[in-house]
């Protein structure tokens, strides 16, 4: 789960009437997206031009550096920091250092930068560049693991240039998304598919952008749309605002991916809002980010215990945001909630032969491959799955209601999340402990 990109610039526009707020947010978001669309169109055109590898590499590096300067504060400083991460990581990767060492080194650099900014009271600058660096670190780590897997002492320019192209791809520098090395080159090498198909991609992209801007307006102007009648409603609206700002980023990047001819799915808001389980919520929140963590952290199984591997994966996810207690405690809470629910539902499914596990039985050959006595369509399974769907919706409120506007521009204090969760009697944690206890009894 991740919302690493700054959204503070739009949250400042909430005051005033609904019409004024909506207009200001729509203009601000469209201005940001239109710049990125220009980059997408430019590089869609460039990829069809037969230029040499050397020229292509220089174009990518120059344009990416310019993009970082264009979208961030302290333009030159941001470009230097961005390229410093690249130079150090690539130098270590070429020397066959482990991907884990490079990931740990980049996280250490990120935390050092955060402390430096904090010392000079520039926390807002760090928050503005954090999302860019997080995606950058993920790509650098992917390159490091690829080089480690290749295990070759002979490093040719053609191979090096392919990694540089992957790391320095301007349309994905600001909002992402993260693509694996294979996904990126599948997208880059895709041929022109004809006017009708390309027009279809453009229409889908424009629809995604329209939905993204609509959700951005609701996220920033939610108290103009809805008047909370209780504290719970206010908490639910705060959590909704956090989610919808995340959907704005995801749908925008989905539009860019579609324009460039890739079929990678970034996120489907409906699969998050109405998820079968908290496990599905986590995996659907940002699918490329989840893929990175699953492939490079969880599947490598540094520990014998599944629980330890789950919490280690969520810990790495939180550290990619820097030392952010609010994000760390939220991600670890989600990990604990998802783990306890998954264990309980797995036990419940096996004990009573019901299709109620956190993941639905797979569909093969257009038919449900379910060997349970009580399938998804039976009454008791439907009721139990509906209960967990509603519980997942509550967990979204519980974990998202801590992201209030009070400290969003400078970072949240240590006890902020605990105080807000205390107003709900730590209910999601209590439910999770109950699930763990019941899974031992059943």
Swiss-Prot record:
Q: Which residues cross the membrane?
A: 26-46, 51-71, 84-104, 125-145, 157-177, 199-219, 247-267, 319-339, 381-401, 418-438
What is the annotated localization of this protein?
A: Membrane
- What sections of the sequence does the record tag as coiled-coil? none
Its EC top class is transferase
How does the protein's chain sit in the membrane according to the entry? Multi-pass membrane protein
**Pfam families, alphabetized:** MBOAT (PF03062)
After gene disruption, what is the outcome? Embryonic lethal with severely defective embryonic morphogenesis with no endoderm and excess mesoderm. In addition, embryos have defective mitotic spindle orientation in the 8-cell stage ABar blastomere.
| Reactions performed catalytically | [Wnt protein]-L-serine + (9Z)-hexadecenoyl-CoA = [Wnt protein]-O-(9Z)-hexadecenoyl-L-serine + CoA
Tell me its EC number(s), please.
2.3.1.250
Q: Which UniProt key words apply to this protein?
A: Acyltransferase, Developmental protein, Membrane, Segmentation polarity protein, Transferase, Transmembrane, Transmembrane helix, Wnt signaling pathway
**Which PANTHER family is this protein grouped with?**
PORCUPINE, PROTEIN-SERINE O-PALMITOLEOYLTRANSFERASE PORCUPINE
Protein name as it appears in the record: Protein-serine O-palmitoleoyltransferase porcupine
